[in-house]
Design a protein with these regions (language model features):
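Autoinhibitory propeptides
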Residues: 2-268
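Substrate-binding/access-modulating region of protease and related hydrolase catalytic domains
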Residues: 345-423, 484-487, 491
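C-terminal subdomain of the subtilisin-like protease fold in secreted/lumenal serine endopeptidases
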Residues: 505-585
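Extracellular S/T/G-rich loop segment that most often corresponds to the catalytic His/Ser-adjacent loop
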Residues: 280-282, 288, 421-501
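Subtilisin-like peptidase catalytic core
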Residues: 24-34, 39, 43-54, 73-82, ...
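Subtilisin-like serine protease catalytic core
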Residues: 264-297, 302-352, 402, 427-429, ...
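Extended low-complexity, serine/threonine- and proline-enriched intrinsically disordered segments
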Residues: 54-90, 186-206, 585-653
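C-terminal edge strands of extracellular/lumenal beta-sandwich accessory domains
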Residues: 604-618, 670-752
Length: 752
C-alpha cells in the first residue's frame, strides 16, 4: 500500500476586510411586540429590587433566556450591557434550556446595578417612543425610519441604542435571577460564577472557610454538606453547578478465566520501547510482564488494598504491553510498550476530587509521557448543560502539558442503549473510545453522546469484546494465574493508546496529527457519527499500517500549521488535472486543541476553527480576488459574508467543534469537476468566544484524502507538482521510523 505523505510549506494569513453585516437588524419578516418589551421591563424592575437587597457581592448576576441557539453576533448589544468593555466579557455562564423539544441558550451576565438602571431607562424610552407612534409591534421598516430620520431629543436616547435595544428584545425571551437550592447530602463539587474575587475571600463573606487543597480552580471547589447548605441559604445565586463528589468505577465483567501454559513463552525484557501512562486501579507485580511496568501506588498507605483492587488495572496494562499475544486478530503491528502504571483508585469507587488532584501531579512529574490511558468512569450520566468538572480538569491538563488522554466511553450494565456517557468521557480534547463487537456492531453495554447536546462523543470505537463466548471477548492478564476474557470500553481504550503512542513516539507525529489520523481512518468514506452517537466517527482499523497509508487510487497527505490570523490559508495544492478536470472525490479531517472554560457552560470551547477545502477559483474581473469552492458548500467564512443561522452552522458545519470531518459521497453518478486555476485550497478561519487573539499560534493538523474516480494512481504526478510549487514532500514510512527510533535510543559509550 502507498505510504501517506506529509506536506510542509508556508501558509499565508490575513485579517477580514469587514464584518459584512453592518448594524443590528431584525430577521427578515420578523417583528417585536411592544407588549414583550414591556414584559422584559417588568422583569428587569423585579431583578433590580432583588439586587438592591443583596449586598454580599458588588454587582448583579442576571440570566438571559434567549429564544433559540444564539450566534455571538446576535447576543445582547444594549440590554444589560450599558457599561464599558465588550459585552462578551460580562458573560459568566452559558447553558441550554428546553421547552417543548425546542432548545435555546441561557447566558448569565455579571453586571453593575447602574447597568440595570440604564437598561430600565432605555427600555422605558423605547416603550414611550413606540407608544407615541401608536405601534403595537415593531418591524425592520420602523427601525429603518429611525436610521434615516433619527429620534426626537426629548426621548433622551440615541438612534443606535434604540435600534440595538429593539433587536435585543427580539432575541431575548425573558430575564431572571437563578438560584440553586438542589439538596445534596454528600460532599459536593460545585462551580461558582467568576466574580473576579479571590475564592476564599468570597466564601468567607458567607462564613465558609476552606483550605487550598479543596480548591480545584478559581471557580471549582469541594464543599462539605454543611458548607453547601450555608452557601445555598445565603447565596444560592452564586452556584453555577453542583454534583456529589463520588464517582463509582464502572467495573467491567471478567468472565471465563482459564490458564494457558504457553501464555508466557518467549517473553523478553524491555529495551527502548515508548512509555504509555496508565491511571487506573492497581497493578499485580507477580504477572509475567511485570518487568515492562513501573508501578506506583498513589493512594494513602492507610488504604488497605484487596485482591480485586489489582484486577482491572493489571488487565488494562496487559493490553498495552502485550495485547496481541492473547488477541492475534487484533495484532496492530505496533509491537510492545512499556507502562508507567499509577494506582489512583480501588475497585469499590473513588473520590473524583482526590483522583484528579493526583492525576495533575502525576502528569506534571512525568513530562516525557505523552499518551495517558484512563479506563475509569462514572456510573452517573453527564449533564446536558455542563462539562463535568473531571473532564474540564483533564482538558486543562492537556492544554497545559501537551499530552493526550485516551478515555473509556463507560459502560451501561443495564444495556439500555440510551444511557449517556459518564464523566470524564465528556472531555472534549481527549479521545473517547466506545466498544464494538468483532462484527463492528455497537456493544450491548454501549453508552451514548453527545456532550452538551452537540459535541461528538465518543470520538471513535474499537473492539472491546461482547457476549459470553471467549471468541468474542478480549484476552487479558489480570493476575499470575493465566488468561482472562473480558469485555468493556475499558479494554477498547488501551488499543487506541497503543496506536497513538506509536504515531507520536515511533513515527514522530504531534498529538494533533496523531488524533486526526485516528479519527480520519475510523471515519473513512462512510462516517458513523449518526444520530445514535454510539460509535463516534467509526471503528479504527486494526493495523497501524492502514492508519498511515492509502489505497492505490488515493492521494492522502498531512498538513500541519499554526493559526496566524483570522484567516490562515494556502491556495496552492496542485491536484492532478485530466482533460481540464479534477477526477477526484475528497475528504478532510481537521483537529485542534482549543482552550476550554468550564465556567462558560455550553460555550465551553474558546475558539472555533472553520475549515474550507476545495477547488480554487480566481475572479476573471479582479484576479486579486481568490476564493475556495468548498466540497461541503460551507460559506460561513466567505470573505463576502453570508448569513447562516447558528443552529445550521453547528449542525451542518460543526461550528465550535474541535474536530471537523468533511467528506464527499461516492456515487457512480459522480462526475469530475472543472479545474479553474488548477489548484485546490485550504482555509481555516479562527473565531473567538471573547474578543482577542487567544488562538494565534495554536497548532492544527489536517488529513486530506483524494480518491480517483477513474481508479488511476497519480501519486507521483502529485508529488512532482508539489515540489514545483515549493512544498516539501515526505513519506511516512513505518519501517524507517522504527529504525530511526531504535538508533536514536542506542546508548553510546565514550572512551576515556
Amino acid at each position: 500500500m502507498p505510504k501517506i505523505l506529509q506536506l510542509k510549506g508556508e501558509f499565508s494569513s490575513k485579517r477580514p476586510i469587514s464584518n459584512g453585516f453592518g448594524g443590528a437588524k431584525l430577521p427578515s419578516g420578523k417583528t417585536v411586540l411592544l407588549s414583550h418589551i414591556k414584559e422584559l421591563l417588568d422583569q428587569l424592575v423585579v431583578i433590580e429590587t432583588y439586587w438592591k437587597n443583596v449586598t454580599d457581592i458588588e454587582g448583579a448576576l442576571v440570566s438571559v433566556y434567549y429564544r433559540s441557539i444564539i450566534a455571538k453576533s446576535n447576543r445582547v448589544r444594549s440590554l444589560l450591557v450599558q457599561q464599558s468593555g465588550p459585552p462578551e466579557e460580562l458573560i459568566r455562564g452559558a447553558k441550554f434550556g428546553w421547552h417543548n423539544n425546542h432548545q435555546f441558550h441561557i447566558f448569565t451576565y455579571y453586571i453593575t446595578l447602574e447597568n440595570i438602571a440604564k437598561s430600565i431607562s432605555i427600555l422605558s424610552a423605547v416603550i414611550s417612543y413606540f407608544n407615541d407612534q401608536n405601534k403595537d409591534s415593531i418591524a425592520q421598516d420602523d427601525l429603518n425610519h429611525i436610521t434615516q430620520n433619527g429620534i426626537p431629543s426629548s426621548y433622551n436616547i440615541s438612534k443606535t441604542v434604540m435600534i440595538n435595544m429593539v433587536v435585543d428584545c427580539y432575541y431575548v425571551d425573558s430575564l431572571c435571577v437563578e438560584e440553586n437550592r438542589v439538596q445534596i447530602t454528600e460532599n459536593s463539587i460545585i462551580s461558582i460564577y467568576n466574580l473576579g474575587i479571590d475564592t476564599k475571600e468570597l466564601l468567607s463573606r458567607f462564613d465558609i472557610r476552606i483550605m487550598d487543597n479543596r480548591i480545584i480552580s478559581e471557580t471549582t471547589l469541594n464543599l462539605y454538606p454543611d458548607e453547601l447548605a450555608k452557601l445555598q441559604s445565603r447565596a444560592p445565586y452564586l452556584i453555577a453547578m453542583q454534583l456529589e463528589d463520588f464517582s463509582k468505577i464502572n467495573m467491567d465483567e471478567l468472565i471465563n478465566t482459564d490458564n494457558h501454559a504457553n501464555y508466557i513463552e518467549d517473553f523478553s525484557g524491555p529495551n527502548n520501547e515508548p512509555i504509555i501512562g496508565v491511571l487506573d486501579t492497581h497493578f499485580d507485580e507477580s504477572v509475567y510482564f511485570s518487568e515492562w511496568v513501573e508501578y506506583e501506588n498513589r493512594l494513602s498507605s492507610d488504604i488497605e488494598l484487596s485482591r480485586l483492587d489489582y484486577y482491572h488495572g493489571t488487565a488494562v496494562s496487559s493490553i498495552i504491553v502485550d495485547g496481541p499475544r492473547g488477541n492475534p486478530l487484533l495484532d496492530d503491528g505496533c509491537g510492545r510498550f512499556r507502562v508507567k502504571h499509577f494506582g489512583v483508585a480501588t475497585s469499590q469507587g473513588f473520590s473524583s476530587f482526590g483522583m484528579l488532584r493526583m492525576i495533575r501531579n502525576i502528569i506534571s512529574e512525568n513530562p516525557e509521557i505523552k499518551v495517558w490511558n484512563l479506563s475509569l468512569g462514572s456510573v452517573r450520566e453527564i449533564s446536558p448543560n455542563f462539562i463535568s468538572w473531571e473532564a474540564a480538569e483533564l482538558d486543562r491538563i492537556q492544554n497545559q502539558y501537551d499530552v493526550l488522554f485516551v478515555i473509556a466511553g463507560t459502560n451501561d450494565s443495564e444495556c439500555t442503549h440510551c444511557k449517556r456517557i459518564g464523566a470524564p468521557a465528556d472531555s472534549i480534547n481527549s479521545i473517547v473510545v466506545n466498544s464494538v463487537d468483532r462484527y463492528k456492531n455497537e456493544a450491548s453495554y454501549t453508552r451514548v453522546g453527545p456532550v452538551l447536546s452537540f459535541f461528538y462523543k465518543p470520538d471513535i470505537s474499537y473492539f472491546g469484546g461482547d457476549g459470553n463466548n471467549p471468541d468474542g471477548l478480549i484476552a487479558v492478564c489480570k493476575d499470575s494465574l493465566g488468561v482472562s476474557y473480558v469485555s468493556g470500553t475499558s479494554y477498547a481504550a488501551p488499543w487506541i493508546s497503543r496506536k497513538l503512542a506509536f504515531l507520536i513516539h515511533i513515527v514522530g507525529l504531534d498529538r494533533n496529527t496523531a488524533k486526526a489520523l485516528i479519527i480520519d481512518s475510523a471515519a473513512g468514506w462512510s462516517r458513523s457519527d449518526d444520530i445514535s452517537h454510539a460509535k463516534g466517527y467509526g471503528v479504527v482499523p486494526v493495523s497501524i499500517t492502514d492508519i498511515i497509508s492509502m489505497q492505490n487510487d488515493e492521494i492522502r497527505f498531512i498538513l500541519n500549521g499554526h493559526i496566524q490570523d483570522y484567516y490562515t490559508y494556502s491556495y496552492q495544492i496542485p491536484v492532478p488535472i485530466v482533460n481540464n478536470m479534477h477526477p477526484y472525490w475528497a475528504r478532510a479531517t481537521l483537529v485542534y486543541f482549543p482552550e476550554c472554560h468550564q465556567n462558560q457552560g455550553v460555550d465551553y470551547t474558546s475558539t472555533e476553527v472553520d475549515l474550507q477545502f476545495g477547488r480554487v477559483q480566481v475572479s476573471e474581473v479582479d484576479p486579486s480576488v481568490i476564493s475556495i469552492i468548498p466540497i461541503n458548500n460551507n460559506t460561513q467564512s466567505d470573505e463576502v459574508r453570508q448569513y447562516i443561522y447558528e443552529e445550521e452552522a453547528r449542525a451542518q458545519y460543526r461550528k465550535w467543534d474541535n474536530v471537523k470531518h468533511i467528506v464527499e459521497t461516492q456515487s457512480s453518478r459522480s462526475r469530475a469537476r472543472k479545474a479553474y486555476s488548477g489548484f485546490w485550497g485550504i482555509k481555516v478561519t479562527a473565531k473567538e468566544r471573547i474578543n482577542g487573539h487567544n488562538s494565534y499560534g495554536m497548532p492544527f493538523s489536517i488529513i486530506i484524502t483524494l480518491k480517483a474516480m477513474d481508479g488511476i494512481n497519480r501519486i507521483q504526478t502529485f508529488i512532482d507538482s508539489c515540489h514545483a510549487y515549493n512544498w516539501v514532500v515526505n513519506t511516512v514510512d513505518i519501517d524507517q521510523a522504527i529504525q530511526v527510533h531504535e538508533q536514536s535510543e542506542v546508548e553510546i559509550d565514550f572512551d576515556d
